[in-house]
Amino acid sequence: MTEPSSPVLPAPADAAAAEPCPRCGAGLTTDPRFAFWCPTCDWNVGPERPEPTRHERAAAARADRLHRELAAGTSPTARREWLLASAAATLVHLSTAALFLGSLALLVAGNTVQRCLGGVLLVFAVVLRPRFGRVPRGEGVLDREQAPALYGLADRVAAEVGAPRVDLIVLDDDFNASFGVVGLRRRAVLTLGLPLWEALDDQQRIALLGHEFGHRVNGDNRRSFWLGTAISTLATWYDLARPGRLHLGVRTLLVRVGEMIADLLLKALAWLLLQAVQLLDGLTSRAGQQAEYLADSLAARTAGTEAARGLLTTLLLRGSAEVALTRARSGGGRGPRIVRRRGVRSAETARTDAPNPDLLWERMREHLASIPAVERDRLLRWNTLDRTAVDGSHPPTHLRLALLGHGPEQPAAVRTGPEEAAAVAAEIAPHRARIAAALLAG
């Protein structure tokens, strides 16, 4: 057990020689662009974080145990957990169905008071219904006519991993990527964050596609229709049940007492729903993380192990990419942190005096390429030490990298040539300019 890390301190601007570590006396890192820390004892390796909660410690222990089993080749399928999770999901869906059918029965066969109650319950049933996701629309959506080269590359990767062809590709401004099946028709949607796409080389982009399409075939129960909608429904219920602050101006004693009682009831309901969310998370986390490891292996099979490793390493550089984009936005000075938005602003609302978008992406790539090995090592060590960063579907990045290293090096099954890469870049070019302009405008 290591000591809690102190807040990450910036390196002195004139750091020419290594200063001694205040904890162990070894030399600190000296690059003035990054936090200075001690590679010997991990002093200042990351910001100080609160002690992990019981739920976070249990999640970290499950992640470690699954990694050990997969590395040893002895990881049985969690059938018992799947059955329990399916039963819990059935209760969630039955609750929604009972509320809906009960409200209809009151509306059809009840008296006036019962019909009023049925109308209120019907509104609740509609609000609490399962969400199937919506097919995205807007500027970032690319269809096959607009981007034949990108879809052609995506189809080759999907065929390699055994996944159906994607229905829609969406470009947004996040340093991330995702794959989902949405709508009643269950259309496959691939979302590519342009900052991440621009940070990767051609082969790493194929690894990214292989990983995302791997989610279609890796047996992730959390993404199934029955379990996935139950998890999202429970999360919606929890968000709605959390009490907020209601300001009614002048309030009588009776109103204040009523507010206190309602607040206590909502807090109790929210607590129960949170326990249900965490229960489902615990029951499905093993299958979700196992599926994530399988998606990594499919990325390695598609693009080669080296490219898959490079993809995971680049994902650790999200904060550094945000720094580069913020500096470009503010002309080299300090600027606010780039925050993920629900939608990308249109080019018409962006600043007309924004720098050349190509220069923005070039600066980001140059900054990421200039990050020294010791800083990359710090990010990986902090990922190893941060026990609060484990979620139900994504194992820690350091464990994913370690498991890739357990297997043999795989060659790339899919490659892209200069002509295909240039065609894909040309199809994305208008969106590169639009998203860059929106990011620069803040």
PLM feature segments, named:
Residues E160, A188, Q203:
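His/Asp/Glu-rich metal-coordinating catalytic cores
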Residues A230-V255, A299:
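Post-HExxH zinc-binding segment in Zn-dependent metallohydrolases
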Residues L192-A207, L283:
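Short pre-active-site segment immediately N-terminal to the catalytic Zn-binding motif
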Residues G210-G228:
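Catalytic Zn2+-binding segment of zinc metalloproteases
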Residues R205-L209, A295-D296:
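Short cytoplasmic-facing helical segments at TM-TM junctions of multi-pass membrane proteins
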Residues M1-G183, H398, E409-G442:
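Hydrophobic or amphipathic, alpha-helical segments that drive membrane association/targeting
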Residues G119-L121, S224, G228-S232:
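Catalytic or ion-translocation cores adjacent to nucleophile or general acid/base/metal-coordination motifs
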Residues M1-P50, W82, S86-A88, L254-G288, ...:
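Cytosolic-facing loops and C-terminal tails of multi-pass membrane proteins
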